[in-house]
Amino acid sequence: MLENPAYAWDSQRDQYCCRRVLQRLERSCSPSSWRVLGVTEVDLFMPILKYVYGASQLAGRCAVISLHRLRPQYYGDKENEPLLWERAVKTALHELGHSVGLTHCRRRQCVMYSSWRIQDTDAKLADFCPTCRELFKWNLEKRL
């Protein structure tokens, strides 16, 4: 779990800039690290988006996910740890997919489908569709 990334705070948006978090992760990870996934509780954004559940460097080593908007309580629902972790796993797999070069998929149940709303995350499976799975394997073999 990442400590509070105060260095990424944007007072105009009352959120944390995802790019700054990724840059810090990249500088701090060991050259021998294959992939690094940061997990945080803070609300993240990208400059062109209101918020993000996670972000990664396309074909890069670092990714980050935020539990902030993955928590059911954020939407006025009661606490539900199994649902939170299901959402976190899907978001982490999605960002891992980006880190090996995958782009968004059009299949709603594929973990690489873009989540614009939490309902999109909930509708996905915690798995790649057959096409994305093959692309994942191919990209992974190419990078190892």
Predicted regions and their residues:
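Metzincin-family zinc-dependent endopeptidase catalytic domain
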Residues: M1-A92, T103
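The catalytic-center signature of Zn2+-dependent metalloproteases
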Residues: Y75-L144
